[in-house]
Amino acid sequence: MIDPATDRVLITGAAGAIGTALRNGLRANWRRLRLTDVRPIADPAPNEECIIADVSDRAAIERMMDGVAAVVYMTGVGGNYTIEDLFRVNARGMFDVFEAARLAGVQRIVYASSNHAFGCYPISERVSPALPPRPDSLYGTFKAWGEVMLRGYFDRHGIRSVSLRIGTYRPLPIDQRSLATWLSPGDVARLVDCALRHPDPGCLVVNGYSNNTRIKTFDPNWEFLGYRPQDNAEDHVPMLRGMGVDVDGPWEWPEHGGSHARAPERPTGR
């Protein structure tokens, strides 16, 4: 079990949108936070130690693992990525962080996976984490690979882990799909808090959504982990209607991954 009063937790990608939400949601109770990113980290609290570093700098990663009990891995490139950056950060960088954690004796890793790890399942199927991955893109493939890596670290080295298949993380839902897949800032902090506090999660994969009325997945691991999301995208339907968003028509995409499952890949990185 990770002790919020005494154990040091390292958050990578701490200057990003989710990293910032985690800082806001965790620092009141988690008293020893070590934060890292390639960008400056704004307004650190007294219990937040900041380190500017790149996950591709293995020596720096190994140094920052000193005294760390748990790693919350939120680093990653997405969107308009190049193939080179995808391999450098989402493959090699991820491996270096996991391996440095093992060498340092880290007890637990909380990993930002993605719903794009199962994005090719048809939307008619209520996907649970018990099903094998069906990634919808290279991005989703690397996220699924991270889950598989953590399985190996658990089986071979006993490192506990929770992989979070994060849905649409935004301050508010923006379209019909995100009414099902939204993960709010408050709920992402609650989910990570549960992943850190659980006495023994083993090697767990959970879907990272809020308590959305239109949710199209099924996850018994929420109850096991003690995750009780408080926010619901449905509360924002009037706002979206007022913006002219079609929230009542047929589902636009036939797969869970939405447009990712139909978008062309960029094998050359161009």
Describe each model-derived feature in a short phrase.
Residues 96-134:
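Conserved Rossmann-fold NAD(P)-dependent oxidoreductase catalytic core, especially the SDR/UDP-sugar
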Residues 56, 85-96, 104, 115, ...:
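Glycine-rich NAD(P)-binding loop of the Rossmann-fold in SDR/ketoreductase-type enzymes
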Residues 88, 122-161:
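Catalytic helix-loop patch of NAD(P)-dependent Rossmann-fold dehydrogenases
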Residues 29-42:
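Conserved glycine-rich Rossmann-like NAD(P)H-binding loop of the short-chain dehydrogenase/reductase
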Residues 205, 211-234, 239-269:
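Conserved C-terminal active-site "lid" loop/helix of NAD(P)H-dependent oxidoreductases
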Residues 165-172, 182-204, 211:
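Alpha-helical substrate-binding/gating segment
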Residues 42, 52-89:
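NAD(P)H-binding glycine-rich loop region in Rossmannoid oxidoreductase-like domains
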Residues 7-28:
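N-terminal Rossmann NAD(P)H-binding glycine-rich loop of SDR-like oxidoreductase domains
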